[in-house]
């Protein structure tokens, strides 16, 4: 049993295990909960419970994910582990479980494998900011030179995808040993403790939504006689205060305006904060100057764009997606925040078609601008039906 109640005062950080099948991601996840329960008093979660993760639906896509939590001395960690490779792809692209940092599990006995590479690439594409490496199954490797070789390979692979390979912390150990409470050559519990300490020191505390620059996707626009124009929506991040200058970005040319009031539940407030549904009263903005799909932002914080590269997951037939592949020149709607915009898809060189259930990098050109940043999630739709999910990897123009 857990020794203490959930402590809200500790900063909260989201992490997850990534890496090739059978390299020990789930064993390490279970070992983390065990070691942290002994050292820091959080609850133990058994391997079998993590391995039989329940199905979840994120944007209509079926994903199996296990969520566990554990504490270090200074933080509370929420940790995701996926049983299958396809679940990782979907999870990372939809942002169902966003990670502030990832633990790359690589078997010291096998070295980097195809999914090791693919998960590092996915992490780069979807904007996972930090990776820490756990070289697992080190108890099965007698040769110190072999360990060094695998470590070098992993560092090279990280550098290939623009992670700081030379400076990435690599912990060598055995998750199975730690799970069994053993610690020969400090490869068991000591290594896992060291991993937790590394998470504490290497992954910076994420900037809370409320401390980021203000952004609210506009869902609806009203005109109130004698008061002016009100836009409503859920504030995604930051704070808006009365008299704040604001910009309206996307779909048309960017315009500037001023907040003259914030309303929630028909009450007037001095400010609106991240996570709240509210109406923002705008000075000098006409009802027809603004529409659903635009965003209200702190001036200069977000720019409108039309062309970007994306990492996309195409729904399978079973998930209600397309039954047939699509080809180059495919023109679906891209649903950003609150609206659909038509766009053209350019496939990578040598790729002729994309099958349902695939994940693919593509370059998209929209017919209208959208307020966009790297890491922004979107859905791909055909006539209102979701057929894919994606994330902006890199803005081009």
From Swiss-Prot:
Top-level EC class, please? hydrolase
Give the matching SUPFAM superfamilies. Answer: EF-Tu/eEF-1alpha/eIF2-gamma C-terminal domain (SSF50465), P-loop containing nucleoside triphosphate hydrolases (SSF52540), Translation proteins (SSF50447)
Which keywords accompany this UniProt record?
Cytoplasm, Elongation factor, GTP-binding, Hydrolase, Magnesium, Metal-binding, Nucleotide-binding, Protein biosynthesis
Q: Which residues form the tr-type G domain?
A: 10-207
Which GO CC terms are listed, alphabetically? cytosol
The region called G3 is annotated at 81-84
Q: Per its UniProt record, what InterPro entries does this chain match?
A: EF-Tu_GTP-bd, EF-Tu_GTPase, EFTu-like_2, EFTU_2, G_TR_CS, P-loop_NTPase, Small_GTP-bd, T_Tr_GTP-bd_dom
Q: Which domain of life is it from?
A: Bacteria
UniProt-annotated stretches for the region G4: 136-139
For this protein, the Enzyme Commission number is 3.6.5.3
Which Gene3D superfamilies does the record associate with it? Answer: P-loop containing nucleotide triphosphate hydrolases, Translation factors
What this chain does, per the record?
A: GTP hydrolase that promotes the GTP-dependent binding of aminoacyl-tRNA to the A-site of ribosomes during protein biosynthesis.
Q: Which NCBIfam families does the UniProt entry name for this protein?
A: EF-Tu, PRK00049.1, PRK12735.1, PRK12736.1, small_GTP
Family per UniProt?
Answer: Belongs to the TRAFAC class translation factor GTPase superfamily. Classic translation factor GTPase family. EF-Tu/EF-1A subfamily.
- Name of this protein: Elongation factor Tu-A
* Species this protein is from: Pseudomonas putida (strain ATCC 47054 / DSM 6125 / CFBP 8728 / NCIMB 11950 / KT2440)
| Recorded name of the encoding gene | tufA
């Amino acid at each position: 049993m857990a020794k203490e109640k959930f402590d809200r005062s500790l900063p909260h950080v989201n992490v997850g295990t990534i890496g090739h099948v059978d390299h020990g991601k789930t064993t390490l996840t279970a070992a983390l909960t065990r070691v942290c329960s002994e050292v820091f008093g959080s609850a133990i979660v058994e391997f079998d419970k993590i391995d039989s993760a329940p199905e979840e639906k994120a944007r209509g896509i079926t994903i199996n994910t296990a969520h566990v939590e554990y504490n270090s001395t200074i933080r509370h960690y929420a940790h995701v582990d996926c049983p299958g490779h396809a679940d990782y792809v979907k999870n990372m692209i939809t942002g169902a479980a966003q990670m502030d940092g990832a633990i790359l599990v690589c078997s010291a006995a096998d070295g980097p494998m195809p999914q090791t590479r693919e998960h590092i690439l996915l992490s780069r594409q979807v904007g996972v900011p930090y990776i820490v490496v756990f070289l697992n199954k080190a108890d099965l490797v007698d040769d110190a030179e072999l360990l060094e070789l695998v470590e070098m390979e992993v560092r090279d692979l990280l550098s290939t995808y623009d992670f700081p390979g030379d400076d990435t912390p690599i912990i060598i150990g055995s998750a199975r040993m730690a799970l069994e409470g053993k610690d020969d050559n400090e490869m068991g519990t000591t290594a896992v403790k060291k991993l937790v300490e590394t998470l504490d020191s290497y992954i910076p505390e994420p900037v809370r939504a409320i401390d980021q620059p203000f952004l609210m996707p506009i869902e609806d626009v009203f005109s109130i006689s004698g008061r002016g124009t009100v836009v409503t929506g859920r504030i995604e991040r930051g704070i808006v205060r009365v008299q704040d200058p604001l910009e309206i970005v996307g779909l048309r040319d960017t315009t500037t305006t001023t907040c003259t009031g914030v309303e929630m539940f028909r009450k007037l407030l001095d400010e609106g904060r991240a996570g709240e549904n509210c109406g923002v009263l705008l000075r000098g903005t006409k009802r027809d100057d603004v529409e659903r799909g635009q965003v209200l932002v702190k001036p200069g914080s977000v720019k409108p764009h039309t062309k970007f590269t994306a990492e996309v997951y195409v729904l399978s037939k079973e998930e209600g997606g397309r039954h047939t592949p699509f080809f180059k020149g495919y023109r679906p709607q891209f649903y950003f925040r609150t609206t659909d915009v038509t766009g053209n898809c350019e496939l990578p060189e040598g790729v002729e078609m994309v099958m349902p259930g695939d994940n693919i990098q593509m370059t998209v050109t929209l017919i209208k601008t959208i307020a966009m940043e790297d890491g922004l999630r979107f859905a791909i739709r055909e006539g209102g039906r979701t057929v894919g999910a994606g994330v902006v990897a890199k803005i081009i123009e």
